[in-house]
């Protein structure tokens, strides 16, 4: 059977809407700019879709060359500009500690209002730090489809947050 690459995705802010790409450079730290930013709560703990499922509705973009970050909220509000680095902070993700800088400005109030609780946007000190298990996540369409049942039909593959989506593999063959 023929194996094809059917999707490439990234999200400059961890847990926000995935951005589709036609082509990308892949390095040992994953896709450039992917999950470079993340959210923390008022206690400094990482916030993901597990804490606020609605985060996937916020679109974002980051132009590294211009140091320009943009978020587009579902109501159409756009916040765009240079993310001003505030104080340094350490965050723990799946047992790994890494450093970043809190981003100052309107970003925090807008995202907090959307989530319904206080959050702060953080820029990771180094690219490629904010992955869950691996810098790249590879998923086959048939693996996702095999999880469908009478209760869960037409599962949106984006909920699995793949970096690379492949078609033409047997379910879970990408694990090997």
Predicted feature locations:
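Small-residue-enriched flexible connectors and coil-helix boundary/helix-cap motifs
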Residues: 2-176
């Amino acid at each position: 059977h023929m194996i094809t690459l059917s999707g490439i995705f990234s999200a400059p802010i961890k847990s926000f809407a995935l951005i589709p790409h036609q082509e990308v450079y892949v390095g040992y730290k994953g896709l450039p700019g992917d999950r470079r930013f993340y959210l923390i709560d008022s206690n400094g703990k990482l916030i993901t879709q597990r804490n606020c499922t609605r985060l996937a509705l916020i679109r974002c973009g980051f132009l590294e060359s211009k140091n320009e970050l943009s978020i587009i909220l579902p109501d159409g509000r756009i916040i765009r500009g240079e993310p001003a680095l505030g104080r340094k902070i350490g965050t723990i993700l799946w047992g790994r500690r890494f450093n970043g800088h809190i981003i100052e400005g309107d970003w925090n109030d807008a995202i907090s209002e959307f989530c319904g609780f206080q959050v702060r946007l953080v820029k990771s000190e180094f690219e490629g730090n904010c992955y869950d298990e691996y810098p790249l996540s590879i998923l086959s369409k048939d693996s996702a489809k095999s999880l469908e049942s009478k209760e869960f039909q037409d599962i949106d593959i984006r909920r699995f947050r793949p970096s690379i989506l492949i078609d033409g593999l047997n379910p879970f063959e990408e694990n090997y």
